[in-house]
C-alpha cells in the first residue's frame, strides 16, 4: 500500500503492489475453487443443522432399510448379493451375467455399475423413492424371468437391518446446541438470515482485496448447484446422457 494523492490533491492510500492470483494469472486463475469448496461445505453443514442427530439417523435407517429389502428381494430372484454386511451398497451377481440386467435397466432409464468381472454394483440414498425401488425390482425381476413384487409405501422398508452389532455407532454426534434448534423451514430461514446479517459483503461496504470467498457471488450463479441437471447426474452415466455437461466443459476449455 502506497501513499499518493487523490483528484483533489489530498493524501490517499492506494494499492501499489498486487500479488493476488487473479492479477497474475488473469483468466487462468483458479481462486474460485475455494468459493466452490466453501459453498458445498456450508450446504452440508446446514443439512446437518436442519435435520439434527435424530433426523440424520432416521434418514440413514431409511436408506439402509431400502438396501436390505432390495438385497432380500434379489436373493429371492436368484441373484447372489456378495456384501454380507453393508449400509447402502450392494454387489450383485447372476449366473446369466449382466447383459439382461443392463438391457432392462436402460429401458427404464436406470444407470448401474457393471464390472468387467461380471458383477453389478448399486448404491441407494435418501432420494430413492418407493417408485424408484419398484423400478429396480422390475429390472432385476425381468432379467431373471421372475414375477416382480411391488410396494406402495415406505413401511415395507422400515425396521430392516443388516449391520453387525459391533459396527453400530455408539458415540453421540451433532450434540452442539445449533443442531437441536432449527428443524422447521421458518426456523431455518430465520437462522440463516441472522448469520447473513453478521457477514460483511458488497451490499454493506467495500470488501478487502484478496477475500475471494467474500466477493460478490450472485444467487443466480449459486442456485444451479442444487439443480438435478447439475448435481443429480449419475457418476457412471453414458456419454449420450451428458450432452449438457459436455457442452459446459467445452465452453470452459
Indicate residue ranges for each PLM-predicted region:
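Buried hydrophobic positions in well-ordered alpha/beta secondary-structure cores of metabolic enzymes
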Residues: 63, 90, 122, 210, ...
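Conserved PLP-binding catalytic core of the aspartate aminotransferase-like
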Residues: 77-106, 124-127
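Noncatalytic alpha-helical scaffolds and linker/capping helices
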Residues: 104-107, 115-139
Amino acid at each position: 500500500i502506497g501513499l499518493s494523492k487523490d483528484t483533489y490533491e489530498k493524501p490517499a492510500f492506494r494499492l501499489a503492489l498486487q500479488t493476488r492470483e487473479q492479477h497474475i494469472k488473469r483468466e487462468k486463475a483458479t481462486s474460485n475453487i475455494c468459493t466452490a469448496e466453501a459453498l458445498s461445505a456450508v450446504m452440508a453443514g446446514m443439512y446437518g443443522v436442519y435435520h439434527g442427530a435424530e433426523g440424520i439417523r432416521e434418514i440413514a435407517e431409511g436408506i439402509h432399510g431400502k438396501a436390505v429389502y432390495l438385497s432380500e428381494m434379489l436373493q429371492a430372484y436368484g441373484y447372489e448379493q456378495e456384501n454380507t454386511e453393508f449400509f447402502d451398497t450392494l454387489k450383485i451377481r447372476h449366473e446369466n451375467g449382466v447383459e439382461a440386467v443392463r438391457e432392462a435397466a436402460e429401458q427404464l432409464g436406470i444407470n448401474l455399475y457393471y464390472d468387467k468381472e461380471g458383477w453389478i454394483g448399486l448404491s441407494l440414498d435418501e432420494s430413492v423413492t418407493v417408485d424408484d425401488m419398484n423400478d429396480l425390482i422390475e429390472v432385476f425381476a425381468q432379467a431373471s424371468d421372475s414375477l416382480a413384487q411391488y410396494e406402495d409405501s415406505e413401511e415395507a422398508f422400515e425396521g430392516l437391518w443388516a449391520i453387525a452389532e459391533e459396527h453400530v455407532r455408539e458415540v453421540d454426534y451433532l450434540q452442539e446446541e445449533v443442531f437441536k434448534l432449527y428443524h422447521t423451514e421458518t426456523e431455518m430461514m430465520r437462522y440463516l438470515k441472522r448469520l447473513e446479517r453478521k457477514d460483511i459483503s458488497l451490499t454493506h461496504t467495500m470488501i478487502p482485496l484478496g477475500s475471494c470467498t467474500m466477493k460478490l457471488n450472485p444467487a443466480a450463479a449459486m442456485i444451479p448447484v442444487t439443480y438435478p441437471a447439475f448435481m443429480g447426474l449419475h457418476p457412471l452415466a453414458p456419454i449420450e446422457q451428458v450432452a449438457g455437461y459436455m457442452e459446459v466443459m467445452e465452453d470452459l476449455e
